[in-house]
Every structure is written in structure tokens, then in C-alpha cells.
Amino acid sequence: ETAAAAGDTAGVGQIWVDDAVPNTLMFTNDVGTDIQLASTLEVTAAKVTQGTKVASTSGTAINFTGVPAGTKRVTLSMQGVSTDGTSNHRILIGDSGGLETSGYLGAQALVSSGGYSSSTGNISDGMRITITQAADTSNGTVVLNLIDASTNTWGMLVISGQTTNQLTLSASSKSLSAALDRITYTTVNGSDVFDAGMISIQYEI
């Protein structure tokens, strides 16, 4: 904070905080004219909470419940996540009424090092990660961003590299009936068993 801008310099403007009126942001142009930009300036950093890391080494689903109220972004990070089968991995979200298995608006693309690529549109049953063989492991990130709190609408993005030299990109959106409070990482067939890896979760409020 200061009482005034520093000495005028031709062609140079200055941004400063006025100490006579605390938290008032000022701009002084190159001819010395003071312009108030904002008063009661406050900067609030997002609160990031690191959830518990979960081993994806058993069961048919990895469940994360108790998403904090007011959460605006959720990040899942996967390392070496594998199952004993070849069903595509699937991410589902839900609220107090349970998980949602339909109504997603999404698409998916697969790119491999051999030059093969494919895409699938109108995916309505969740976010998918392509699996082509049981040896595939998923490594990457799932990001969920709150689009509209009034309709509990979320935008979702998946980037996952598989150890069989392929990359999955998936994007979707989904509206819930109530606030998001649960996320599940599972498979499309729901019966393949997880046998390796781990998943962590972060919340931003």
C-alpha cells in the first residue's frame, strides 16, 4: 500500500493499492490521472482437500462418497489401475438418490501409437476409458467441474494413458437431482475385478 503512485513515466501506467482507503485498487495512467479500479478488494484462494488414496486391487468398483457440500471441482488421479478383464472402465457420478447410470452427454476418442484411432459419440452411460486387453492399466486424470449449481450440472474430462501404447480422451456433462456427493470408478460390465493400481481424489471448494 502507498499514498500515491510512483513518479509518472511517459507511456507507462501503474497499478497500486491506496493506503488512505484500505483495500482500494488504483490505476494511474501515464499523465498522472488516478482511476479507482476496485474497493474492498479481497482475494480468496480455493480450498483444496486431499482425500484418501484407495488401492484398486479388489472388488468390482472403487467408491468415493461424502463429497463435501459446496464442492466446485473434483479431481481423480489414477496410477496403474487394472482389472482381470477387458470391459471398458467407467466413471459414474451421483447424489443422495444414488449413482446415475444414464443421461450423460458424452463422447470418447482412442489414439494408439500404431496410428490407429477411433471415436464414439452419444455415450450416455457414464465416462469411459477404453480397455483392449486385461494387461491394460489406466494412468491419468478425471476432472469434474461444476457448470451450474442451480441445476447441479457437471462437466467432466478424462485423459488416460494405457500401458499398451494408447490414449483415451473422454468428455461429458451430466445434471443431477441434488448436490454431487459420490463418484464411482467401475467397469461397463460391472463384473470385472480390479487387481492393481490406486486412485486418489481431491476436492476444491
Task: Give the residues covered by each predicted segment.
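Extracellular/surface-exposed low-complexity repeats and stalk/linker segments enriched in Gly/Pro
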Residues: E1-V17, P22
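Short, surface-exposed terminal/edge motifs of secreted or surface/virion proteins that either
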Residues: V17-E42
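Residues in flexible loops and secondary-structure boundaries
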Residues: A5-G7, N23-L25, T33-I35, A61-I62, ...
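Surface-exposed molecular-recognition determinants
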Residues: Q14, T40-I205
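Beta-strand repeat scaffolds of extracellular/surface proteins
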Residues: E1-A4, D30, Q79
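N-terminal cationic amphipathic segment used for targeting or macromolecule association
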Residues: E1-A4, D8, Q36, V43-T44, ...
